[in-house]
């Protein structure tokens, strides 16, 4: 369980009902560098989506050296069981990119999942998280700062025993089929195997590909702390507009967002 640390202020306008609408809206606001007003604005919107979905919402604040303060916005869904699954998406973008696919797409899927949790009926406790300060090219730090704080919190909440997996949704709004990535030598049956099985049940096309080095998304920090993590994102087509001005809302596609959401929902149902 995670205590609610701070209630998120409500965004003024209604939250769109689908991942594509949320991702389009967030990326239409322009770049969202770590610790900026843009990042905070996106996270307020996601916090509202979490609350509208009936989740307990908390904020985990942390310092971004030389930039200010960022945060992780955490929506908690409790079950009678002690096991835990985490689904996260980073909120920031690397200027000058408006960050539609990287990573308003992931935020959109996380927000849509929040509204579907009662229908999904997850088997384990779930933390849905909009992480902050992921873009190392902007923070200048070797770690994804929000993910590091989140992984430490998971570890403090008995993550070594409770956590089944922490999945980063990163660039899930354009290229498809997806790659499922992790820094391990071979797929683990309870992590990559379980996620791939869930994908197969709902027709989401996924191929596991080993990470280069320790990984380049928020799952990295979980693995470095000895907790199981993986990333769902772009496949062989890559992301040609990553960190560029051309990563605009018009590039987002509905199909990959729907397929990502279906896969994760099925994975959350698994025993």
Regions found by a protein language model. Name each.
Residues 59, 74, 85-88, 127-130, ...:
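Structural recognition of the beta-strand scaffold that forms the well-ordered cores
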Residues 2-10:
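Sec-dependent N-terminal signal peptides
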Residues 13, 27-40, 61-64, 94-103, ...:
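Second-shell loop/turn segments in exported
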Residues 94-194, 198, 211, 215, ...:
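Acidic/histidine-rich catalytic neighborhood of metal-dependent amide-processing enzymes
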Residues 10-40, 53, 92, 165, ...:
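N-terminal capping segment at the start of a domain
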Residues 23-34, 50-54, 77, 98, ...:
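Sec/Tat-exported extracytoplasmic proteins
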Residues 22-78:
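A non-catalytic alpha/beta surface segment that caps or lines the substrate-entry region
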Residues 172-271:
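Active-site-adjacent substrate-binding region
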């Amino acid at each position: 369980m995670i205590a609610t640390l701070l209630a998120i202020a409500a965004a003024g306008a209604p939250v769109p009902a689908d991942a594509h609408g949320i991702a389009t809206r967030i990326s239409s606001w322009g770049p969202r560098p770590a610790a900026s007003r843009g990042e905070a604005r996106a996270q307020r919107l996601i916090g509202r989506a979490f609350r509208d979905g009936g989740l307990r919402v908390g904020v985990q604040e942390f310092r971004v050296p030389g930039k200010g303060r960022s945060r992780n916005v955490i929506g908690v869904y409790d079950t009678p069981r002690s096991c835990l699954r985490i689904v996260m998406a980073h909120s920031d973008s690397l200027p000058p990119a408006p960050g539609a696919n990287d990573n308003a797409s992931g935020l959109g899927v996380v927000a849509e999942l929040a509204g579907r949790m009662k229908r999904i009926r997850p088997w384990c406790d779930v933390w849905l998280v909009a992480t902050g300060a992921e873009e190392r090219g902007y923070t200048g730090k070797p770690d994804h700062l929000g993910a590091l704080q989140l992984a430490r919190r998971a570890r403090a909440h008995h993550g070594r025993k409770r956590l089944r997996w922490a999945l980063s949704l990163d660039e899930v709004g354009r290229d498809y089929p997806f790659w499922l990535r992790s820094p391990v030598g071979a797929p683990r049956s309870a992590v990559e195997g379980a996620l791939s099985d869930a994908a197969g049940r709902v027709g989401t096309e996924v191929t596991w590909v080993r990470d280069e080095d320790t990984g380049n998304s928020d799952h990295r920090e979980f693995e470095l702390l000895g907790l199981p993590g993986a990333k769902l994102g772009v496949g062989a087509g890559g992301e040609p507009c990553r960190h560029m001005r051309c990563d605009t809302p018009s590039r987002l596609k509905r199909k990959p967002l729907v397929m990502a959401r279906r896969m994760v929902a099925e994975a959350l149902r698994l025993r």
